[in-house]
Amino acid sequence: VATVDCSDYPKPACTMEYMPLCGSDNKTYGNKCNFCNAVVDSNGTLTLSHFGKC
């Protein structure tokens, strides 16, 4: 199972770097920061499906 450490999130701003991750909601997140902010917003219900685009 792929995991991402989101312990240092949420962050107020994310960089524009593109390193896509696919969430358990079948949505592609542009990078770890965007994904981790969404994980925090979801109260931990969002998980990583896999690295790369969905």
UniProtKB/Swiss-Prot annotation:
Residues 4-54 form the Kazal-like domain. Disulfide bonds join 6-36, 14-33, 22-54. The keyword Heme does not apply. It is found in: Secreted. Glycans are attached at residue 43. PROSITE patterns: KAZAL_1, KAZAL_2. This is Ovomucoid.
